[in-house]
Amino acid sequence: MKILITGASGFIGGFLVEEALRRGYETWAGVRAKSDKSRLQDPKIKFIDLRYKDQEALTEQLRDFAQKQGPWDFIIHNAGLTKTTDRKQFYEVNAENTRRFLHALEAAQCAPKKFLLMSSLSSYGMGDEKEFRPIRLNDPQRPNTDYGKSKLIAENYVRKQTAFPYVILRPTGVYGPGEKDYFVEIKSIQSGFDFTAGYTPQKITFIYVKDLATAAFLALENEKVINKHYFVGDGDVYTDEQFAHLLQELLGKKRVLHLRVPLCLAQTACACSEWFGKMRGKSVTLNNDKFLILKQRNWICDVQPLHEDLGFKPKYTLRKGLEESIQWYRSNGWL
């Protein structure tokens, strides 16, 4: 069985590759020539640099692959941007690259048995902030960030094609060894400070990256899961305060100054951070799109369909996952 995992050099992609190898797949990693392959050192991994920008070249590349190797049995399309200095790039990379890829797979007769799109809870936008009920799959999708909007467009491209079966996963906050966004808060608390945006506690949910990889393969390998979509989370709900204090405990910090700052101040900080990032030509964790995520109070989602259809049971609690992550950060010199 052959599998292609795009975005394989990224945080989530690396764990998807590890899971594929563990399950005995002939594993193809879709990576750019200039990508960091330091986490893709297993000699069994095969590489392909997909030519997303050129529709004809991509089609010919996939046609040539199919003729020589045969189509992949499964494809996990995980490639994408989570932050950028140019918002237009969200739509180009997350949405239009997906459109060209889908078209090329069909035109090149390289259709997989199943195609999995790694999307995001952000494709739904604001959750109910009065009763804080979970976001459900049948709720209207109204993303409020450019990132979320671009992921929704990609989802729609996948849903509209009829060449092969698909499944769409929408993970909530993904954390684990090597993740950089949550690491910002971990590093801040390690330094003795914690800044939380907004005076109303934020309800947040998580999924450990290894559990997400397991869920992805359960969705691919279950023949009954056809043309469906799921939220992926560990099923627990936390407040931002609980998350910060758990980090403090696990880091062994006796004294941390926890400060809640008004949303207007957080917005200013994100805007300034984005401006400085643009001046340096580097994408930054704190940006205007990120502020809209920080502003949202309800990140609770209904993961029951995932458990019912796939029998998915996360192996990691937030505590266990953070313990493993912090150990990795320390072992690799991040902390």
Regions of interest found by a model, annotated:
Residues 209, 245, 269-313:
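Conserved C-terminal active-site "lid" loop/helix of NAD(P)H-dependent oxidoreductases
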Residues 77, 99-146:
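Conserved Rossmann-fold NAD(P)-dependent oxidoreductase catalytic core, especially the SDR/UDP-sugar
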Residues 3-23:
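N-terminal Rossmann NAD(P)H-binding glycine-rich loop of SDR-like oxidoreductase domains
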Residues 301-309, 313-335:
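Amphipathic terminal alpha-helices
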Residues 222-286, 319, 323-324:
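Mid/C-terminal beta-alpha module of Rossmann-like enzyme folds, strongest
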Residues 128-173, 194-198:
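Catalytic helix-loop patch of NAD(P)-dependent Rossmann-fold dehydrogenases
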Residues 50-100, 124-126:
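NAD(P)H-binding glycine-rich loop region in Rossmannoid oxidoreductase-like domains
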Residues 149, 153, 179-184, 198-220, ...:
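Substrate-positioning beta->alpha
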